[in-house]
Amino acid sequence: MGSISLSNSMPITRLPLLTSLYHQSFLPISSSSFSLLPLSNRRRSSTFSPSITVSAFFAAPASVNNNNSVPAKNGGYTVGDFMTPRQNLHVVKPSTSVDDALELLVEKKVTGLPVIDDNWTLVGVVSDYDLLALDSISGRSQNDTNLFPDVDSTWKTFNELQKLISKTYGKVVGDLMTPSPLVVRDSTNLEDAARLLLETKFRRLPVVDADGKLIGILTRGNVVRAALQIKRETENST
């Protein structure tokens, strides 16, 4: 991937505001909102579980005396308190070859990458599923509850995976990425973002600023770390 230079970009003026998990209205983006294109534009639908509760994990302790703790803001934590910042991210461009993106996934031991332009404006996300078109073989895989899958079936799937990799030559990330993904802001309430990750079953949420530039990523691992830290702080404050 070529070098990335920073410069000003056109601001995002209209993004769909996620008003609920099922209904959307088009409004100017606000400092604490999510954004999402209509689900018809996304490759795979998500399974929602409205019964999930995360409030208990992210309620700020009444008083904390810990120099290593992240301070609560307005009685709660925000995405910016626990996200992985931009300087620690691995990113690709639409022009990055699929082979290079796959090598980056393997080298960095991640399952997905933000896709940016030369100005760090987020233009999409791409996952290992996208890059290898794994949807084409996942439907024929063994049931997830099968602890010991059939050897012949597993070997057949592995062979199909090898064939998929052989077909990536000449393709670029822009051909396979998911454009205009669901995003959050660094000021978004952490509990809201955690609930969104749980209910959509996404692995990560890009974090953007008011101009749509990538400033971080909130992953499931970040949420687990936050829950553990807040639990310790709550215990220490009692």
From Swiss-Prot:
Transit peptide start-stop: 1-71
Lineage top rank: taxon: Eukaryota
Signal peptide: none
Pfam family, one: CBS
CDD domains with a match to the protein in the record: CBS_pair_plant_CBSX
Gene3D superfamilies: CBS-domain
Record localization: Plastid, Chloroplast stroma
Biological process according to GO: cell redox homeostasis
Main subcellular location: plastid
GO cellular component, one term: chloroplast stroma
Name by which UniProt lists this protein: CBS domain-containing protein CBSX2, chloroplastic
Organism lineage string: Eukaryota, Viridiplantae, Streptophyta, Embryophyta, Tracheophyta
